[in-house]
């Protein structure tokens, strides 16, 4: 009986190791983020031609992330930038449906905005995290994916946004 119990405990310990989440740290020079699984891959790194980084969760339809640095007027709040983006950019996406704005806190604080749209005849969802770095800089983490897939990885998108850290 003791051997059976010891074997069961050993099995639990070893199986816990197999289910541990592998996290990879991505370093963009100005900031770092943690990618919650090896499925997340970098597809574009910031350079002279592209000032933003892009990532996919296996496939663009499963989850796509673009990180942009937004330089704003002094005193502009993340919610102000979110409202401006909704009014000037997102509203013109095909099939756009505005979602809700929520406060967000991690290493940097800000707001999130969710919305729905149509892309190549597929229903999509978008979620943007606006994170305030200082009174003139806001980072926008723009996630998009299929409407039935992106909400399933909300814990991963939140983890990525919470892990966003300036150097």
Q: Where in the sequence are the language-model features?
A:
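Surface-exposed amphipathic alpha-helical segments
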Residues: 38-40, 138-167
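Soluble non-cytosolic domains of exported or imported proteins
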Residues: 30, 76, 80, 147, ...
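Bacterial N-terminal signal peptides
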Residues: 6-16
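Conserved polar/disulfide-associated segments of primarily extracytoplasmic proteins
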Residues: 45-139
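N-terminal "mature-domain start" segment
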Residues: 21-50
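Positively charged n-region of N-terminal signal peptides that target proteins for export
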Residues: 1-4
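Solvent-exposed, polar/charged alpha-helical surfaces in well-ordered, non-transmembrane soluble domains
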Residues: 33, 83-87, 155-162
